[in-house]
C-alpha cells in the first residue's frame, strides 16, 4: 500500500503530434486519459479537486467520441482501478453521482450502462455487491434507444382505455409526468410554445401521450386543464408501469420519442432535444 500522499494534479497523456484532427485527439485522450494514474494509490480518493474534477472532464470528453470508444474507455478505466478496491468503489460512486442521479445535468444512461456492465464482470465485487448494479442494468435495458418501447394500457378521464402500441402516427411523444410538479409544468410549457411540436401535432405527424403513473386520481383530474386538448391525457389505472417496472420512474418528468413502430429514438430527452429532432426529421 502506498502511504505517502503526494497527489496534487492529474497528469494527462501526451497526445501524439500525428493525431491532428479534433476527432483523433479526442479519441486518443478518451482511451488514454487515466494512463498516468496509479490506482494502487488510494490517496486519489481523498482529492476530489483532482480525481472528481478529472472524472467530470473525462465524461465531457466521452461526449465527443463514438459510443463504442466511450464504452471501451470506461471499461478500461474500471479494469485499471481494480488494483485497489477503495479506488474502484470511489469511481463507481462518481458514476452514480454524475451518470445515474436524476438531478445530475451530466446524467447519461448509455455511459452508465458501460459502468454497470464492467461492475457485473468485475472480480473485485462479490455477488452481494453486484445485486444493485444488476437491478439497475435490467431496468436500463428496458426502453433503451434502438429497442421497442414496452406497451401498456392507459385510461382517459372518461374511462375509455387505449394502449401505446395502438396509437398510429409517424412519431409518438410519451410524456410521463406528475400533475403540478414544477419541472413537469416547465416541460408542458416548452412543448406548448414550440412551433415545431405544435405544427407536427396539427399535421398528425406526432401524437403526444401524457401519462400519469401514480395513484392520486383527484390530483390528476385537478390538473387536466394544464394540458393541451390535442394531447392524449391518460393515467395508469392498474399501476402496471410501477408494479412491473416497465419504465424507469426515478426521474419525473420523462420524455420518450418513438417512431411509427414504437422504437425508442430519444429517451429521457429534454423538450429542446425533442424539438431539435423533429425539426431535422419531419
Annotate each PLM feature:
Residues 1-160:
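Oxidative protein folding and maturation machinery
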Residues 162-191, 207-211:
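Short active-site neighborhood of thiol/selenol oxidoreductases, capturing the structured segment around
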Residues 150, 172, 252-253:
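Short loop/turn microsegments at loop-to-beta-strand junctions
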Residues 155, 232-236, 268:
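Short acidic-hydrophobic, aromatic-tinged amphipathic segments that line or gate anion-handling sites
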Residues 221-256, 260:
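Short, internal strand/loop/helix patches
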Residues 185-225, 239-243:
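Structural microenvironment flanking redox-active thiols in thiol-disulfide oxidoreductases
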Residues 251-254, 260-282:
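Non-catalytic, surface beta->alpha helical segment in thiol-disulfide oxidoreductase systems
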Amino acid at each position: 500500500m502506498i502511504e505517502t500522499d503526494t497527489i496534487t494534479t492529474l497528469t494527462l497523456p501526451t497526445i501524439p503530434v500525428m493525431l491532428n484532427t479534433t476527432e483523433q485527439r479526442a479519441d486518443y485522450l478518451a482511451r488514454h486519459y487515466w494512463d498516468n494514474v496509479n490506482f494502487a494509490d488510494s490517496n486519489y480518493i481523498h482529492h476530489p479537486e483532482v480525481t472528481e474534477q478529472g472524472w467530470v472532464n473525462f465524461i465531457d470528453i466521452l461526449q465527443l467520441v463514438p459510443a463504442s470508444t466511450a464504452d471501451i474507455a470506461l471499461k478500461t478505466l474500471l479494469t485499471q482501478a481494480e488494483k485497489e478496491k477503495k479506488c474502484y468503489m470511489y469511481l463507481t460512486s462518481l458514476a452514480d453521482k454524475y451518470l445515474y442521479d436524476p438531478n445530475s445535468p451530466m446524467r447519461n444512461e448509455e455511459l452508465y450502462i458501460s459502468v454497470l456492465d464492467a461492475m457485473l464482470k468485475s472480480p473485485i465485487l462479490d455477488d452481494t455487491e453486484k445485486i444493485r448494479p444488476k437491478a439497475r442494468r435490467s431496468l436500463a435495458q428496458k426502453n433503451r434507444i434502438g429497442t421497442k418501447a414496452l406497451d401498456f394500457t392507459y385510461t382517459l378521464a372518461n374511462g375509455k382505455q387505449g394502449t401505446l402500441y395502438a396509437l398510429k402516427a409517424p412519431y409518438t411523444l410519451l410524456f410521463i409526468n406528475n400533475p403540478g410538479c414544477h419541472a413537469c409544468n416547465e416541460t408542458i410549457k416548452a412543448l406548448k410554445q414550440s412551433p415545431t411540436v405544435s405544427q407536427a401535432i396539427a399535421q398528425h405527424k406526432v401524437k403526444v401521450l401524457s401519462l400519469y403513473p401514480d395513484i392520486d386520481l383527484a390530483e390528476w383530474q385537478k390538473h387536466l386543464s394544464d394540458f393541451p386538448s390535442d394531447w392524449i391525457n391518460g393515467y395508469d389505472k392498474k399501476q402496471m408501469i410501477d408494479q412491473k417496472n416497465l419504465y424507469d420512474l426515478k426521474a419525473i418528468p420523462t420524455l420518450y420519442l418513438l417512431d411509427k413502430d414504437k422504437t425508442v429514438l430519444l429517451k429521457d430527452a429534454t423538450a429542446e432535444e425533442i424539438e431539435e429532432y423533429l425539426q431535422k426529421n419531419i
